[in-house]
Amino acid sequence: ACVPVYKECWYPQKPCCEDRVCQCSFGMTN
């Protein structure tokens, strides 16, 4: 249920956006 940006990416508390590259695994939170 992510928008097309990393709005809900709070790795590892939340999963990464399924339709985007998992950049939140590198510490990105937006």
From Swiss-Prot:
GO terms for cellular component: extracellular region. SUPFAM superfamilies: omega toxin-like. It holds the Pfam family Toxin_9. Expressed by the venom gland. InterPro entries: Spidertoxin. GO terms for molecular function: calcium channel regulator activity; ion channel inhibitor activity; toxin activity. The keyword Disulfide bond applies. It is found in: Secreted. It comes from the Eukaryota. Keywords: Calcium channel impairing toxin, Disulfide bond, Ion channel impairing toxin, Knottin, Neurotoxin, Secreted, Toxin, Voltage-gated calcium channel impairing toxin. Disulfide bonds join C2-C17, C9-C22. Belongs to the neurotoxin 02 (plectoxin) family. The presence of a 'disulfide through disulfide knot' structurally defines this protein as a knottin. Antagonist of L-type calcium channels (Cav1/CACNA1). This is U10-ctenitoxin-Co1b. It comes from Ctenus ornatus (Brazilian spider). The lineage of its organism: Eukaryota, Metazoa, Ecdysozoa, Arthropoda, Chelicerata.
